[in-house]
Amino acid sequence: MLLLSCNNQETYAEQKEKESKAISSFMDRDITVRDADGFEVCKVGKIVTISEEQFQNQGYTTDTTKNEYVLFNNTGVYMQIRRMGTGEKLEQGKTARVICRFIEFNILGDSIQLRSDVNVWHPKPDIIKISNNSGSFTANFDTEINGGGAMYHSYGSTSVPSGWLVPFSYINIGRQDSPEEGIAKVRLIVPHSEGQVNATSNVYPCFYELTFQKMRD
């Protein structure tokens, strides 16, 4: 069956090929993400890909001095761990609420599409309710506490992008109790198949910088 999109009648296969090329170009461009006023938001740089085997051999870490990202072949998600975070990993059989703040950069659009690390969203961060089910993570955006954050209000869905769940096997999700501590921070390249609902529908990849911190009980 041939799948067609309304995007100039490109086939789905053509859209996926365009996405793949955009990701490759993004990784090779030594890019700096800037806001609408031209101010630097984060320096991405030229990305070095490592395998899952190398990632494991390095103790499930990525060398930020080399700008390493691990590629997970089963999903196409690339991940860099900037900070492991405080506390502990989410244990099997446990559920937690996690505060998330992020920058979302549309790689095909070459611009910031959404960000919650700005003043307007500080009182209403995205809250992820996440469960570890025998090493498999499921999650949704919890709207009961604050009515939902930037992701819910922008895309109208409580579904957490599958790509966002990848880091939880490797990071800690405690709270920052002193200035010397740092909460978990990761960077991701997420293809449409693992992305938010709009990316999935329109076949575009996103770059994310995200922080995660466990809510107080």
Task: Tell me the role of every PLM-derived stretch.
Residues 6-217:
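Cross-family detector of peptidyl-prolyl cis-trans isomerase
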